[in-house]
Amino acid sequence: MGKIIFYEDRNFQGRSYECSNDNPDLQPNFNACNSVRVENGCWMIYERPNYMGHPYFLKRGEYPDYQQCQGLNDSIRSSRLLSQNLGIGTNKLRVYERGDSKGEMMEFLEDCPNVYDRFCSHEIHSCNVLDGYWIFYELPNYKGKQYLLRPGEYKRFTDWGSQTAKVGSFRRVIDIC
């Protein structure tokens, strides 16, 4: 079972709200969020209600100044607990240089801290998650905007919620939960 605690002020101060399952609308529970403590599980949090807006992945740990470490404003409006058995088994991802799974393809079974070093491009236009859950990051070394990819085909970058094809790095969820 997961557990996440949201705090209105930095360093776990101010009014708090504890959550142990999906919550499509956090707005009635607090006005702003400036620190977060994840006691159990892995979570995706979103800037807007109903799991909309930009998602951010959080693993177990403390985030005393959430805005600074994640580059967010203080607007967290929904949260989703990721399945506790993510990443059990193998992980397999195919990335493509063009949309609709066309062009050069590379298959990955492991994390990739720098897409350009492995794929000779800063852009991934489509992909196919064959097994496991993966997180795409906008920048190398697992930094910047994040996108959670579940098993399935993503014919274009907008399918995983991005506005651009820029992917700097990606990793398997198993290594971080």
Curated annotation (Swiss-Prot):
SUPFAM superfamilies: gamma-Crystallin-like
A GO molecular-function descriptor: structural constituent of eye lens
GO biological process: lens development in camera-type eye; visual perception
Residue ranges, annotated region (Connecting peptide): 84-90
InterPro entries: Beta/Gamma-Crystallin (IPR050252), Beta/gamma_crystallin (IPR001064), G_crystallin-like (IPR011024)
Every Beta/gamma crystallin 'Greek key' domain range: 2-40, 41-83, 91-131, 132-174
A Pfam family it matches: Crystall
PROSITE patterns: CRYSTALLIN_BETA_GAMMA
Keywords, ordered alphabetically: Eye lens protein, Repeat
SMART domains: XTALbg
Keyword Repeat: yes
Description of its domains: Has a two-domain beta-structure, folded into four very similar Greek key motifs.
Family: Belongs to the beta/gamma-crystallin family.
Subunit structure: Monomer.
Protein task: Crystallins are the dominant structural components of the vertebrate eye lens.
Protein's UniProt name: Gamma-crystallin M1-1
Organism this protein belongs to: Aquarana catesbeiana
